[in-house]
Amino acid sequence: MCCGRPLISQGLLDEARRHAALNTDRLHPLARAETPIVFFEPSCLSAIREDAPALVRGELRQRAQQVARHAVLFEELVEETWAAGRGTLPLAPGPSAILLHGHCHQKSMGLVAPAKALLSRVPQARVVDLDAGCCGMAGSFGYTRDHFEVSQAIGERRLLPAARTMPAGSVLVASGMSCRHQVHDFTGVRAVHTAKLLSSLLARPSAGDQA
């Protein structure tokens, strides 16, 4: 089931309200059990955490609010767990520099800071917050013919030039799928999600460790 973000962005609020109700019904048992509901896409998290409670009414709104309280971004959960001493990741040394591009919804929810803190735990890597504003794609905005030039112009302000001039041995991290598409479409650079980068750096057990 879709989070409803595309419907909300297009102003199709009646259909978005139906999605919010369905998602609330499906996710509420997890929230009631105090289980974190982990999202990898900031716009999806925003739809569940911020928009769904406002779209539904009555008792359903109370359940949606409970779901929202247990909805977390991947970077947020891992950094919180690490900082609290409840778990760590055995990371090998990573790229010399990690360029971080925050998704617009990630910024609006104040979740760039935990992403930067988590990436800063990669050994020997320097994390640079590009603070580049919107990538220009804005969900489906940049995919339409009428918005193509505006979308590119927004990206060319900071993000796309930064991608083209990345130092050797560095990597561009972006949690938003639309952001990654925008970067690749205009520069050929393949930005990666934080989870994918961390997965690639997990120290693999040796044969002796497995014995």
Regions found by a protein language model. Give the residues of each.
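Iron-sulfur cluster-binding electron-transfer modules in prokaryotic oxidoreductases
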Residues: 1-211
